[in-house]
């Protein structure tokens, strides 16, 4: 949540005052960063490259995070984006093997899936990346401390080391980059459930899985486990999963999940979990009973700020525990800053990297920079994936100052016509009729994330629908549909409600 922003002039004055103070006060570091995830490492390296003396602390490495373990690389590298994507790749091969038969591949005998082998490969990769991040810090002359950091003053950080000893360091600037952690709802028997942390490191593959949640983590793990052969039941509170995404895309994702064999339970929660000899008995909010080998709670994440001593120092937090910052990522304490999930702005790794880069440029690069949150693309790596950039149809109508034009293309991908898989792709463009600018794009289908990255550049540059139309497509490809949608699917009059075709 943003607090009152400093103007560029105020920021420069504050920076000048800080420089003045530096001549009178000696600090151990120009910058001390708490948290060596994507945002923290980026801020540390770029600040050091600008001449700053930088220290950073991070909890000891472990695939499953807790209050006392973590690891350089943070959630994305160790227990988030990277290991999850590896499992998505692994799960996708199941369907690919089925589809291969109609492409002439004779697959004789049983095709077995070895969960433990994939798990080991995943662990090897995150260890490799963990070491790369450490080398990046070392190469930038950033001093890395292993231990838990907490702020004990406007310019002082205390690090509790592995052996329990505490060492304090002073710094002209302190950056909070501690990320977020998974949370569990307080349902009876909740201790029997796991979060996404544990889901990435299960010793045994679950043959029966129940997932509670309707967000991207929930649908991704449902897709992963189903793709690997598990029976999966997905429970969520709304009528459709993926609240906040385009409704038409949400409906297609739901159909695809069901088409892949996932049992959907909309407008349903879990009431109780009970340990039995046969597994975990799950009672739904409608009184139905299920049995599972694993129950995943994918019900949101909270800022990882509880143990930082922020309130004692006077740093303002919102009700969820997120650090309040201005447009430059500065807190109400001039020497303390925060980036990434700890601020609960847009909780994506590339956004944390952007915020960290802006921080380094502002504080040590002499170039005050504000993070730009417009047209941030994102993807949900369900199978097949969903990717979006800009406004959904619903958001466009809400913010409209004139009529909105919606262009859609739904089709069976060329690959599916031979394999026989009945799974449509859908592409969508939202256009402001008054300016002809494309203000939103969505795609659900194979390679959606790879395609959407290019579309995001176009939206960032302010591309018009006419410019899309004048672009020559790559044929045959799914991507060419984005430049061949000539006919308006529907026009939404100013102040009207969106109407989807589903």
UniProtKB/Swiss-Prot annotation:
Residues the record lists as binding glutathione: 38, 133
Keyword Oxidoreductase among record annotations: yes
List of residues binding NADP(+): 214, 217, 220, 237, 243, 300, 379
Superkingdom field: Eukaryota
Its EC number(s): 1.8.1.7
Disulfide-bond pairs as recorded: 76-81
A Pfam family that the UniProt record links to this protein: Pyr_redox_dim
Keyword NADP: yes
Family annotation (Gene3D superfamilies): 3.30.390.30, FAD/NAD(P)-binding domain (3.50.50.60)
Annotated localization: Cytoplasm
Keyword annotations of the record: Cytoplasm, Disulfide bond, FAD, Flavoprotein, NADP, Oxidoreductase, Redox-active center
Role: Catalyzes the reduction of glutathione disulfide (GSSG) to reduced glutathione (GSH). Constitutes the major mechanism to maintain a high GSH:GSSG ratio in the cytosol.
Record-given protein name: Glutathione reductase, cytosolic
Organism: Brassica rapa subsp. pekinensis
Lineage: Eukaryota, Viridiplantae, Streptophyta, Embryophyta, Tracheophyta
């Amino acid at each position: 949540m943003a607090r009152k922003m400093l103007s560029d002039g105020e920021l420069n004055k504050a920076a000048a005052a800080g420089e003045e103070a530096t001549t009178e006060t000696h600090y151990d570091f120009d910058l001390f960063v708490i948290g060596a995830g994507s945002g923290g490492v980026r801020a540390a390296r770029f600040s050091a490259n600008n001449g700053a003396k930088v220290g950073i602390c991070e909890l000891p490495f472990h695939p499953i995070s807790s209050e006392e373990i973590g690891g350089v690389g943070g959630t994305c590298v160790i227990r988030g984006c990277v290991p999850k994507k590896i499992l998505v790749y692994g799960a996708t091969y199941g369907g690919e093997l089925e589809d291969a038969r109609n492409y002439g591949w004779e697959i004789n005998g049983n095709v077995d899936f070895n969960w433990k082998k994939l798990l080991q490969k995943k662990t090897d990769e995150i260890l490799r990346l963990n070491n790369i991040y450490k080398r990046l810090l070392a190469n930038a002359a950033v001093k890395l401390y292993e231990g838990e950091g907490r702020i004990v003053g406007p310019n002082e950080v205390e690090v509790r080391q592995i052996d329990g000893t505490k060492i304090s360091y002073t710094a002209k600037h302190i950056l909070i980059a501690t990320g977020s952690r998974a949370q569990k709802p307080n349902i009876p028997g909740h201790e029997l459930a796991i979060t996404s942390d544990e889901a990435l490191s299960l010793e045994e593959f679950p043959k029966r899985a129940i997932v509670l949640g309707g967000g991207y983590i929930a649908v991704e793990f449902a897709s992963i486990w189903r793709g690997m052969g598990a029976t999966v039941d997905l429970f969520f509170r709304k009528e459709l999963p993926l609240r906040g995404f385009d409704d038409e895309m949400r409906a297609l994702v739901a159909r695809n999940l069901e088409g892949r064999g996932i049992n959907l339970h909309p407008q349903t929660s879990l009431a109780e979990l009970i340990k039995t000899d046969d597994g975990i008995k799950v009672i739904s909010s409608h009184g139905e009973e299920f049995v599972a080998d694993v129950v995943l709670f994918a019900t949101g994440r909270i800022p990882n700020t509880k143990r930082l001593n922020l309130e004692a120092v006077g740093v303002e937090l919102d009700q969820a525990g997120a650090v309040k910052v201005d447009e430059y990522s500065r807190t109400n304490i001039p020497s303390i800053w925060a980036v990434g999930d700890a601020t609960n702005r847009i909780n994506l790794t590339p956004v944390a990297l952007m915020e960290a880069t802006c921080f380094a440029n502002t504080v040590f690069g002499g170039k005050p920079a504000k993070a730009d949150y417009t047209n941030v693309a994102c993807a949900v790596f369900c199978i097949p994936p969903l990717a979006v950039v800009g406004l959904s149809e619903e958001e466009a109508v809400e913010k409209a100052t004139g009529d909105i034009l919606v262009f859609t293309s739904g089709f069976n991908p060329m690959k599916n016509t031979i394999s026989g898989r009945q799974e449509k792709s859908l592409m969508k463009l939202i256009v402001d009729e008054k300016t002809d600018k494309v203000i939103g794009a969505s795609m659900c289908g194979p390679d959606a994330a790879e395609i959407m990255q290019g579309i995001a550049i176009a939206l960032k540059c302010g591309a018009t629908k006419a410019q899309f139309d004048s672009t020559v497509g790559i044929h045959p490809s799914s991507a060419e549909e984005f430049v061949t949608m000539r006919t308006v699917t529907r026009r939404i009059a100013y102040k009207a409600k969106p109407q989807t075709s589903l």
